[in-house]
Structures are given as C-alpha cells and as structure tokens.
Amino acid sequence: MELKGTKTEKNLWEAFAGESQARNKYTYFASMAKKEGYEQLAAIFEETAGNEKEHAKIWFKLLCGGAIPDTLTCLDMAAGGEHDEWTEMYPRMAKEAKEEGFNQIAALFTMVAQIEKEHEERYLKLAQNIEDGT
C-alpha cells in the first residue's frame, strides 16, 4: 500500500516529531539533574531519552520505506530540510514574532536561518563530493 498522503503517514510524522522532541527535552533535563547533583535522576532521564530515540527511529524508518536511506539520499534529504528552514520556516517565524513585538525572538529566528543556510550548503557540497567520488 502507498503510505504517502494518508492519515497514517501524518500520524507517523507526528509520532516521529513527538519522540524526537521528548528525547531532546529529556537530555536537557538530564543535564540539569547532573548540574544539581541528582546523578540517579540524570541517568533515568538519559535512559528514557535513549528509548525515545529508538521509538523515533522506528517511525522514521517506516516513513523512509522501512530503512534509513543511503548516505547520498540522507545528504539530499538533510539539504532539503535545511533549505525549507532557512527560506520558509524561520523567515515566517521571524516575521510573526516581530509583528507580535518579540523582536529578540525574531532576531534569533533570523540568526538561526543563516546557520541553516550554511548547513544546506555544507550538505550539498558533501553530496557533490560523493557524486564526484572525492
């Protein structure tokens, strides 16, 4: 069956995003727990973050047809994601933040957009290196 365009595909993307966000949050929580001297709690957060990473990997593999793609495809996907972030997502977010009076947040969105542009350029160069065999 074709997954593209289905509710299930949408749900897989939502599950992937949720697990990915949880992993990052738990990693941040582990850092704070360590900083505050709660080593056991930090270890629990880190273990759970690892679980969330594996959950995200399950959903991502399904979205990719059952396996993580080859490196060249990964570079192309990464470049495309970075391109969307710096050309569409962050400019829109910066504009909206500025309209709402959050000028510092708007500036951060703009700054990160520039970094995402550099990421795209790097991925494209690396993909070209693979294609050229260098």
Would you name each region that the model predicts?
Residues 1-134:
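Non-heme di-metal
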